[in-house]
């Protein structure tokens, strides 16, 4: 591989031709290398990447992985994935050849990562460690599926951390009514929490709502988007899942409340966000209401659990509840099984009748 010295500034550069994925010949020029060896190494790595050679560096393969995967993901999903790759994975493996990383290397990496702590000094949770390992494993799986790598060393090494069941907190109707009574003098937060509790929608779905999503004649609320704050910008995305696209029937009192709220909003356009709040503002409002009312502290997302709990207590099926909140019925059954009344005794009694006892 030839490298050339720039007579003007003394640095090195490479210039070469290669065949791209369309089969067309392309020319590449790269300047600014301090040494001839660095210039040649860059050319070699570039060509291995273009040829999908698994002897390329891990860092080069991650660039391919980003090119392949990023367009398929929502921006917030990719940013979460990219942060882990950049801070927890690349610093350890970037200079290694993709094909030479072993399960032993992954175990050594796991042991190193386990020693890391948050800025507060706390250890990382088992959930987070599992997620970090999963991101590494995803990279190797991608290399196996599309680039000819034979073995996933991360899978062979075994997982790091474990998925912990998250504690499910929720308010009873009585607790919620105490809380919302304390929010009466904060109109925007009051109506936001009313929608969250009585409709069971997600936080991002709430913050993306516009007047066009409400049909007061039919008393319905349309959910077809979600709000995120990403890289300092407000971003409206599609909802979390396909099932999340839904139309929710609102109770009469909530319809009346929202019409009253709209009258308070000056210059409201059909596509304006009706709750121009941040997630932090909602969280702060929740903390205020909990303290003022004396009810137990729960997360914003737990209002969704509270809505599901209320519907279960009212006797609705997992299918009906799943359709309302945008979950599959099997997921509702799995997550909230402990809240559904048992029917085992009723089943046994009916089997007795069938047999003739």
Question: Which residues does each predicted region cover?
Answer:
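N-terminal DNA-binding module of tyrosine recombinases/phage integrases
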Residues: 7-108, 265-270
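Conserved tyrosine-mediated DNA breakage-rejoining catalytic core shared by Y-recombinases
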Residues: 13-15, 159, 208-260
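N-terminal core-binding DNA-recognition domain of tyrosine site-specific recombinases/integrases
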Residues: 67-156, 165, 187, 276-280, ...
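Active-site/catalytic core of tyrosine-dependent DNA strand-transfer enzymes
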Residues: 83, 173-177, 226-229, 251-296
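DNA/chromatin major-groove-contacting recognition/catalytic segments
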Residues: 109, 178-182, 232-238, 338-357
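Basic, Lys/Arg- and aromatic-enriched nucleic-acid-binding interface segment
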Residues: 122-126, 130-132, 145, 149-209, ...
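C-terminal catalytic core of tyrosine-transesterase DNA break-rejoin enzymes
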Residues: 127, 145, 194, 198, ...
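Catalytic-site neighborhood detector that most strongly recognizes the C-terminal catalytic loop/helix
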Residues: 170, 227, 255, 280, ...
């Amino acid at each position: 591989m030839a490298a050339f010295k720039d007579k003007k500034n003394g640095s090195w550069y490479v210039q070469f031709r290669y065949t791209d994925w369309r089969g067309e010949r392309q020319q590449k020029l790269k300047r600014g290398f301090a040494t001839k060896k660095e210039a040649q190494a860059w050319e070699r790595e570039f060509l291995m990447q273009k040829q999908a050679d698994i002897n390329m560096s891990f860092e080069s393969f991650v660039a391919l992985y980003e090119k392949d995967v990023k367009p398929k993901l929502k921006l917030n999903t990719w940013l979460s994935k990219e942060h882990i790759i950049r801070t927890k994975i690349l610093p350890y493996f970037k200079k290694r050849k993709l094909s030479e990383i072993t399960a032993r290397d992954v175990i050594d990496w796991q042991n190193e990562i386990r020693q890391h702590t948050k800025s507060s000094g706390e250890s990382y949770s088992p959930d987070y460690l599992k997620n970090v390992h999963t991101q590494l494993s995803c990279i190797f799986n991608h290399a196996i599926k599309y680039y000819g790598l034979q073995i996933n060393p991360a899978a062979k090494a075994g997982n790091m951390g474990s998925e912990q069941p998250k504690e499910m907190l929720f308010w009873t109707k009585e607790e919620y009514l105490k809380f919302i009574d304390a929010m009466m003098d904060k109109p925007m937060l009051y109506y936001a929490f009313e929608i969250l509790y009585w409709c069971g929608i997600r936080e991002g779905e709430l913050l993306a709502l516009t007047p066009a999503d409400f049909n007061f004649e039919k008393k319905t609320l349309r959910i077809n988007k979600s709000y995120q704050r990403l890289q300092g910008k407000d971003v409206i995305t599609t909802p979390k899942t396909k099932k999340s696209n839904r139309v929710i029937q609102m109770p009469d009192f909530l319809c009346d409340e929202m019409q009253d709220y709209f009258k308070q909003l000056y210059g409201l356009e059909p596509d304006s966000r009706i709750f121009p709040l941040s997630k932090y503002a909602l969280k702060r409002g929740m903390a205020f209401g909990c303290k003022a009312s004396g009810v137990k502290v729960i997360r914003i997302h737990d209002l969704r659990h509270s809505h599901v709990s209320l519907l279960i207590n009212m006797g609705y099926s997992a299918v009906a509840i799943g359709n309302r909140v945008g979950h599959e019925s099997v997921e509702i059954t799995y997550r909230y099984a402990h809240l559904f009344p048992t029917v085992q005794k009723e089943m046994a009694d009916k089997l007795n009748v069938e047999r003739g006892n």
